[in-house]
Amino acid sequence: MAAQKSSVAVIGGGIMGGDIAIIFAAGGWNVHAMSPSQKTRDALPARIAAGLKKLGAPEVNAANARTHATLPTLPWKDIGLVVEAATEELPLKQKLFSEIEALARPEIPLASNTSNFPIGEIGRALKHRSRVAGLHFFMPAHLVPLVEVVSAEFTDPRVAESLVTLMKTLGKAPIWVKKDIPGFVGNRLQHAMLREALYLIADGVVSPEGVDTAVRYGFGFRFIACGPILQKEMSGWDTNALVGTALYPHLYSTPDYPAAVKAMVDKGYLGMKTKRGFWEWTDESI
């Protein structure tokens, strides 16, 4: 059930689907992107060409991308991998996977780019669930190296391993998430930090500017060189154990989203999109 370099079906041509199409086109794959939206299909060729140029990939590869309005029109006998990147609606994804299973060759991997739903729920009703896995890219997908390959309880490990290998050949930095947990790994790490930051702001400990400064010019400054585990390997786990033992009881662990931020959202203060969030924004500052 390994994905063989040939043709990839990208289901959904929106922001994520378009970026995923760019990744595979840059890698020399034939790309078949399906979207029911005529507007999306019309825009996709130019978007892929622009993405290839930004990546420094051969622009002639854009000619290997095709768009389709419906699933049955894809050349399924040639498709070696399916990546679903449709709207984040669970019933829609389940319906798509059911239709794809009836069309795709039985030996090819079927992957979902979902960031919200368990892979197990997306593929639970399929007859051949062992070939279903998560392939979670981060926006902008063609520029951000990280990809999470997610195994559900029924995913064949060989499928996950083949996707990890494939992502490496496409120049990505994949990790294998071996349990189908909410948020996978990247989003859990981001939100763990964000929860602490928002509560520190809500409790008047520090300003929003102070939080961003602490991250950008403190520990975040080192992250491009090494992650948190390697950093502690370097500084010593004995030191970390002492600090963590003293500090962890004081960290925010509530499951509730901060009321102060909820109130801000209720007022319509959503950030740049509404010209006000923690800060006020103008067209010039944006």
Q: Where are the predicted features?
A:
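Rossmann-fold dinucleotide-binding core
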Residues: P109-G183, N187-R188
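Structural/interface elements that position substrates and couple domains in central-metabolism enzymes
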Residues: H32, T169, G186, Q190-E196, ...
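Hydrophobic/aromatic beta-strand patches that form the interior of the parallel beta-sheet core
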Residues: H32, H68, V83, A133-L135, ...
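NAD(P)+-binding Rossmann beta1-loop-alpha1 motif at the extreme N-terminus of oxidoreductases
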Residues: M1-K54
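Acidic/polar active-site rim loop that often engages polyanionic ligands
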Residues: A26-W29, P140-V150, I224-C226, T245
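NAD(P)-dependent Rossmann-like dehydrogenase/reductase catalytic/cofactor-binding core
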Residues: A2-Q4, G27, T169-I175, K179, ...
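Rossmann-like NAD(P)-binding element
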Residues: K39-A43, K53-P109, F117
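Rossmann-like dinucleotide-binding cores of NAD(P)H-dependent redox enzymes
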Residues: A33-V60, S151-V159, P174, P182-L189
